[in-house]
Amino acid sequence: MSTSTQLIPIYTSRGDMDAYLAYPYLYNKQGEWIGWVSPERKVFSVHGHYVGWLADGPRILCKLVEGYGANRIVIPVPDEMRINPPAHVPLAPMMPELIFGTIDVLLEQPELLPPVDFGELREDMD
């Protein structure tokens, strides 16, 4: 990862840091690539499934009625599949409560953003 790329911590609604954004790529706390963010702030898994959107805070949210995207897109692969996360991150800002029918993906459904080697909805090797 180049030194010019800024890592933005992504928080849960509880205030825990659970991911990093090195735009447009998302990485988990261990530094593994877990997703991609479009210019419209839509979040996709490494397997190309729609997961939700990047809200202010920042945090990753989705509507319960949307579900996990069955339609897939081809997302660009980062130059580096892994980053070295920093040892310390800033405290989470105060975030508004979620409205009814909206969930925090990293808090309630983190399995929607698996690393590239994992995930139930990845393509078969056959």
Each predicted region: which residue ranges?
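N-terminal leader/targeting segments and the first structural element of proteins
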Residues: M1-I34
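Long terminal segments
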Residues: M1-I8, H49, A55-D126
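Preference for short coil/turn "hinge" residues that link or interrupt alpha-helices
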Residues: R14, Q30, H47, P93-P96
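Compact, well-ordered interaction domains used in eukaryotic information-processing assemblies
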Residues: P24-Y25, Q30-G57
